[in-house]
Amino acid sequence: MASSDALAAVFAHIEDNRAAFLDRLIAYLKHPSISAENIGIDEVGALLVEMLTEIGLETRLVPTDGHPMVVARWEKAPGKPTVLLYGHYDVQPPDPLDKWVSPPFEPAIRDGRLYARGVGDNKGQHFAQILAIESHLKVHGVLPCNVILLLEGEEEIGSPHIAGFVRANTHLLKADLAITA
């Protein structure tokens, strides 16, 4: 299958599953993960491990001196490049609550747009990447490259432990290309 045809099949799968994917994103956004207040971090990290494992990635929650890192990998494309996708699963506190039109952890669609704490920074972005990986695997059974996901739980408090984590785990993060979302 030509690469444009292969990609078209993935896009068709995504379109066919659009409503279900939106429901899953909304369910994910309902989980608070406020790093500054240590609310929901462990739960969302565990949820990501479960989600990524279910779609076929080798996944683990890696402890740090702060909040854990989620590291997931699909490395079944020998000789192909490896892409590292970086994101974060923590969010800012939603205060002041009276400025929200709807509760921050009760996602709402208004005028065709989704509103929730974390949808634009950064849960929505890495969830879209996860769904793209899942879709490609469902349609083709393989990815066109190797993939590593690194999702941290401390970006919103300045990523105090990521430098040490990267230094100590370069063997886990070796990639040809890194993308931050």
Regions found by a protein language model. Name each.
Residues 2-119, 136-144:
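Acidic/His- and Gly-rich active-site-bordering loop/insert found
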Residues 122-181:
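Acidic/histidine-rich catalytic neighborhood of metal-dependent amide-processing enzymes
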